[in-house]
């Protein structure tokens, strides 16, 4: 398999998880599309390693591998196909590598929303630093933190909800009821903003819409329908 084929495979895997992007990326400048999907695909690889599956050990090993890979990117070396696009970007890859142990440790539920956000703050700050370089403009660490909380919820379901939310919903709640309550909290408190790079605004808007629909009863991983995606992405792109 060639490097180009391997890269296309990882990008394709991300697109399978986020089919909305085929509609939404029409609002992303053409010159930013390749870097956008590669960077989003890398983040998906990291969060799935941290929060995917029932056994955390394979994911911890994968995050350890990624820490070494990102250190290599800062020194001009790469092994992973996503590095074909991303390694040449002069972003703070070392900062992201250093934050991966925090991501690995974030599988356990936090006590409250504030604690959940604080637990992910180092990885959110690292992502924000890379966002600013990839998208050539200032990004917001609070928005990166909300993205991480949303991804954690979509991957872990009930297990992602802080203990405070579980106590509020009580015993005997329907399956994924705790997760739906947490999704409602996140979607209501995550305020859309007009600043930040356009690809990030669009992705955040789609995540908020997924959360809103899940809170209202949709399956947790169901994509946003195409017509709704078009409307949501257009509004986010306008700023």
Which positions does each model-derived feature cover?
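Short pre-active-site segment immediately N-terminal to the catalytic Zn-binding motif
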Residues: 114, 137-142
